[in-house]
């Protein structure tokens, strides 16, 4: 369970992971060593899983964002576990695949990709379709992005019984 101080630390670090323990301590009203211990505990518990830099994809030459929805039919030779293994391997090995989700509903997978342009996107989509043994795919190209964030607000703390 997270207390208010842990929640505040997570909020601060998600906003700027480069904050020093001294800056965090000042913001939450604790000592530097207490903050250090709390952050280490959040890491050990797997709540904080890493620290990353947010980059501008356009400035890195990858201005095109697309979402691909795949439907995969399984056969006796190619069961769902095999398809998941192929998809997991393909997604993990390609740096242009930013996210890959196995989903419930009409589609089997939703994949977020970044590409230099239409030709690179076409090659990437062909590769993904081939790896999945896709029976159907729909690709949506992003025209404008109004919000893109990896920030996660913790669920509210359960209320104590009165």
Q: Which stretches of residues belong to each language-model region?
A:
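A compositional/biophysical signature of low hydrophobicity enriched in polar/charged and small residues
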Residues: 1-162
């Amino acid at each position: 369970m997270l207390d208010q101080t842990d929640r505040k630390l997570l909020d601060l670090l998600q906003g700027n992971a480069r904050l020093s323990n001294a800056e965090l301590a000042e913001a939450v009203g604790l000592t530097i060593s207490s903050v250090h211990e709390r952050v280490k505990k959040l890491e050990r518990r797997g709540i904080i899983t890493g620290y990353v830099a947010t980059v501008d994809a356009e400035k890195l030459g990858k201005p095109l964002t697309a979402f691909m929805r795949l439907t995969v039919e399984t056969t006796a030779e190619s069961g769902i576990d095999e398809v998941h293994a192929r998809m997991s391997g393909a997604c993990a090995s390609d740096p242009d695949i930013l996210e890959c989700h196995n989903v419930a509903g009409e589609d089997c997978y939703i994949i977020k990709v970044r590409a230099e342009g239409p030709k690179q996107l076409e090659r990437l989509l062909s590769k993904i379709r081939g790896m999945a043994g896709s029976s159907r795919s729909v690709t949506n190209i992003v025209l404008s992005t109004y919000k893109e964030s990896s920030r996660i607000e913790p669920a509210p703390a359960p209320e104590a019984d009165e």
